[in-house]
């Protein structure tokens, strides 16, 4: 009987510590990004010849947001609007005020189905590395950019994005790596920061083409 109690106690400690190891990101967070909206210094961006050609051919009209299309991934990883994070058993939802984006990060071990087509938001799966959430997003559309300054994104089958989300007190931190060998010699790295807003709100967002820059 005594040994059974020890085993039971050990089991509770083991699984209890595993559960609490997962970070608590639920709630509304307001943007508090570093300079340049968390984008790297231009000198740190190493483009391939193909990427440089795309960059030099960029005009502001190619920004998807000017066509009232949501920025998606990787362009929408960092923006000045609040986000809300909701935990569910099989997924984590990231709700963006910007363009009312709803992002599903599946955490139940599933992989992208064969029929999944490239899209602005792609297909995101997540796993816990201690209290850090690691998100991998694939199936991304070429109708996107890495950043509004003209940094390109190929949308190739081999292109993907890895994010690491962690919490430090009331601060939520993101490091994102854009893996796009067509355009970049090494991953393009962005950093985002948000502050917990227990009384925060997600407001309605509306994109009106004539005000967005569409002629």
PLM region spans:
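Short, linear, compositionally biased motifs with a strong N-terminal bias
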Residues: 12-13
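N-terminal signal peptide c-region/cleavage motif recognized by signal peptidases
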Residues: 16-18
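Short amphipathic alpha-helical "recognition" segments used for binding
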Residues: 8-9, 167
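Bacterial N-terminal signal peptides that target proteins for export
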Residues: 1-8
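Hydrophobic small-molecule pocket/channel-lining residues, especially in calycin-type beta-barrels
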Residues: 2, 20-215
């Amino acid at each position: 009987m005594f040994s059974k109690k020890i085993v039971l106690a050990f089991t509770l400690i083991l699984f209890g510590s595993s559960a609490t190891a997962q970070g608590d990101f639920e709630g509304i967070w307001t943007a508090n990004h570093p300079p340049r909206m968390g984008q790297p210094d231009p000198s740190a961006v190493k483009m391939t010849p193909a990427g440089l050609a795309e960059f030099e051919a960029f005009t502001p009209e190619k920004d998807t947001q000017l066509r009232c299309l949501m920025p998606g991934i990787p362009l929408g990883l960092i923006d000045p609007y609040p986000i809300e994070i909701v935990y569910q058993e099989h997924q984590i939802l990231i709700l963006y005020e910007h363009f009312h984006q709803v992002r599903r990060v599946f955490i139940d071990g599933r992989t992208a189905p064969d029929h999944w087509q490239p899209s602005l938001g792609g297909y995101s799966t997540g796993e816990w590395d201690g209290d850090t959430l690691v998100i991998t997003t694939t199936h991304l559309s070429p109708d996107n950019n890495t950043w509004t300054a003209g940094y390109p994104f190929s949308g190739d089958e081999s292109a993907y994005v890895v994010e690491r989300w962690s919490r430090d007190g009331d601060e939520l931190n993101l490091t994102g790596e854009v893996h796009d060998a067509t355009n970049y010699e090494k991953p393009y790295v962005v950093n985002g920061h948000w502050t917990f807003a227990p009384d925060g709100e997600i407001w309605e967002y509306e994109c009106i083409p004539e005000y967005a820059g569409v002629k």
